[in-house]
Structure formats: structure tokens, C-alpha cells
Regions:
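Accessory RNA-recognition modules of RNA-modification enzymes
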Residues: 1-195
Length: 195
């Protein structure tokens, strides 16, 4: 395997921090932003110290765990809620396995693992979010929302974010309109300009 080569494989499992594991011959490749069971195309972008990482290029086949359509208009470009197409119970099960593995790897004694307790509400539950101003794309219009998955600078408008109450969507829309109307620029990290 060499950097830049493209492969296809099935994500066998997802470890904490959304790190998918794809087996290619005798090599396990870490591919972020997938769901167990998805057949994906990825490009090798890091190879060092016996570890290989790939960048997801395309989902070729859905996973059996993907049993519903996404509710969000900017899914899957946004990295805010990766598992929207999975049933909530399946998300909890997968996350519980990830947490249990973290504990198993960290402690060398027996312990009692309490299962995850799911929220009674699946969407519009967040009372805190960190939205950013930025360009929708390079030199594009001002946007206010969440960073595009895998991007430090591109920001997707979160006009109908399903993680927050609809009142927050209205506030975001008003704030964005206010700054666009006045031509106020966001703070550009590289140029040290804007507000």
C-alpha cells in the first residue's frame, strides 16, 4: 500500500472518534466518517509506524444499519451528526461498544459497566452549540453554521440543524442576515482581518 492509492472495502467496525476499520488483505486501514457495513472507496493518505489511514472518497453501498433517510438538509457534508441514517437504538449500541472498549483498554481490573441510557428525545436536544462564521466555499458568500466535514475553513449554513431547537435556527438566520446586510466580514485567521 502506498500513499495516494485508491482501494475499496467494507467498514467492519467503528472505534471511538469515528474511526472505521477496513481490512485490505492483511492490513487494517483506518477510514473516518463511515458506518459499520458500508462498502466504501478510499484513498491512502497516511502510512507510518505500521498504521495506515485512508480518506473516505465515496460510499459505494449503504450499510444494513442505515434504515432511514437523513432529516438534515446538509447531511452528509456536515460533520455534526454522522449517524443520522441509523436508528437511534443502533447508534446507542455502537457508542456503548466504543466506550466499553475504551474502558477495557484503559483498566486492568474487573469493573461493572453501566449501559448507556438513551435520551427520551433524539433531536433538538442540545442547549449549547458552537457555530462559526466563514465562507460557504473559498471566497464564497458569508455563512454561519458548522464546519464542512474535513474542512477547517468552509462553513455550511445550519438553517435547519436538527440538533438544536427550531428557535436557534431562527436566531442563526437573523444573525446571518444582519451581518450579510451590513457587509461585515468574519475573522480570517490567516490574514488576521475581519471581526
Amino acid at each position: 500500500m502506498k500513499k495516494g492509492e485508491i482501494y475499496e472495502g467494507v467498514i467492519e467496525k467503528i472505534d471511538f472518534q469515528n474511526k472505521g476499520r477496513v481490512k485490505i488483505k492483511d492490513t487494517t486501514v483506518t477510514v473516518k466518517n463511515g458506518i459499520p457495513g458500508q462498502k466504501v472507496r478510499f484513498m491512502i493518505n497516511k502510512k507510518r509506524g505500521g498504521r495506515v489511514e485512508g480518506r473516505l472518497l465515496e460510499v459505494l453501498e449503504k450499510s444494513e444499519l442505515e434504515k432511514r433517510d437523513p432529516l438534515c438538509s446538509i447531511f452528509p457534508s456536515c460533520g455534526g451528526c454522522m449517524y443520522q441514517t441509523m436508528l437511534y437504538e443502533e447508534q446507542l449500541k455502537m457508542k456503548e461498544e466504543q466506550i466499553k472498549k475504551l474502558f477495557d483498554d484503559a483498566v486492568d481490573y474487573e469493573y461493572t459497566f453501566e449501559p448507556i441510557k438513551g435520551s427520551p428525545i433524539e433531536f433538538a436536544y442540545r442547549n449549547k452549540m458552537e457555530f462559526s462564521f466563514g465562507d460557504e466555499y473559498k471566497d464564497g458568500p458569508l455563512s454561519l453554521g458548522l464546519h464542512k466535514k474535513g474542512s477547517t475553513y468552509d462553513v455550511l449554513n445550519a438553517e435547519d440543524c436538527k440538533l438544536v431547537h427550531e428557535d436557534m435556527d431562527k436566531i442563526l438566520s437573523c444573525v446571518l442576515h444582519y451581518f450579510r446586510e451590513r457587509g461585515v466580514s468574519y475573522y480570517h485567521k490567516m490574514q488576521h482581518t475581519g471581526y
